[in-house]
UniProtKB/Swiss-Prot annotation:
Biological process annotations from GO: 'de novo' AMP biosynthetic process; IMP metabolic process
Binding site for GTP: 12-18, 40-42, 307, 333-335, 415-417
Protein name: Adenylosuccinate synthetase
Organism: Mesorhizobium japonicum (strain LMG 29417 / CECT 9101 / MAFF 303099)
Location in the cell: Cytoplasm
GO molecular function, one term: magnesium ion binding
Binding-site list for IMP: D13, E14, G15, K16, N38, A39, G40, H41, T132, R146, Q226, T241, R305
Co-factor remark: Binds 1 Mg(2+) ion per subunit.
Reaction equations catalysed: IMP + L-aspartate + GTP = N(6)-(1,2-dicarboxyethyl)-AMP + GDP + phosphate + 2 H(+)
Magnesium as UniProt keyword: yes
Annotated positions binding substrate: V301, V302, T303, G304, R305, K306, R307
Amino acid sequence: MANVVVVGSQWGDEGKGKIVDWLSERADVVVRFQGGHNAGHTLVVDGKVYKLSLLPSGVVRQGKLSIIGNGVVFDPHAFVAEVAKLKAQGVEVTPDRLKIAENTALILSLHRELDGFREDAASNSGTKIGTTRRGIGPAYEDKVGRRAVRVMDLADLETLPLKVDRLLTHHNALRRGLGHGEVTHDAIMAELTSVADEILPYMDRVWKILDDKRRAGERILFEGAQGTLLDIDHGTYPFVTSSNTVAGQAAAGSGVGPGAIGYVLGITKAYTTRVGEGPFPTEQKNEIGEFLGTRGHEFGVVTGRKRRCGWFDAVLVRQAVAVNGIKGIALTKLDVLDGLDEIKVCTGYRLDGEMIDYLPASQGAQARVEPVYETLEGWKGTTAGARSWNDLPAQAVKYVRYIEELIGAPVALLSTSPERDDTILVTDPFQD
């Protein structure tokens, strides 16, 4: 039996929500290990739609333990709001069903404000990253800068004021430099103490809980957010998120050893999308892009932003397979391609007249690569709702097999609609 890490193999929005929900029914524990409330996912359980951005997907299922690991940056006010929203939908998130790592760094209002100040300034200079303005990056900066306020600090009101002072020394200098007013000590203390009683009951030693669960033979699902190409090290820097999104982060971001991870599942969309700024070699700024966006309902769960759309890029996914150690992929949204006369797949790049089979690390080179396509015949039948290979048109099967060949990883799961049961299981990741 394997513990499973789920990661996005593209720029996020690959359909992880449905796959994680599908897997969470088989898991005993579901863990978030990086990111914050900037990455939304939609779950459909028993006909009810749940939209989550911070909480692990396991919270909507009875009998599952959900964990927010130390690799997450945690907005306490967003947490309280999301818990209240779920309660209104009939889901009680209680401390016996959810644990938050005691050493998790907090996102405060000053982080959100700084995020917005920088994006506004960057917009004027043409260097905008396209963040969600939710304070994710500034919170990670404070964590690395060793001045973050962490969950455990809410329980120690004697030392908390000193930590707030240290944080404000840094932030108020930044705010003055950006032409904004300072934040007062009392304002931040009030912000923290107002939510402390709602957060502290969930606080625990997550590393110990996970070690006990692992030794007891329970199934652990590690739920990644965003995608590989948004990784702070391995993504299209600087147009990335502020955390490591690759599978290796599951260990560091939760407190388990890497040996506890048995299977890495890469969620992979049958075409490619991206939100925000940055390079996108196969982007289609034409009727194909509009078709994919409309058919695929490509709008962000958190921001509502329209996603950029393009053909499947095997170069990027092949690189993601290598960087993550992906054993199998869950191919999603195949049904969006139904009805196209022809479908293109990027098999390589041309850079300054030479053929390459990887994405360069240089920002300048990333902007210059030209996709090299192979054109496949489309299919007239429908893949929507298919639950076995026999239900798929022959050309759709050919497309899937071609992708497997190009990326060097097999399809473990194939999703054919947003409904969780419309899934073709080839390999159960937990049985690896």
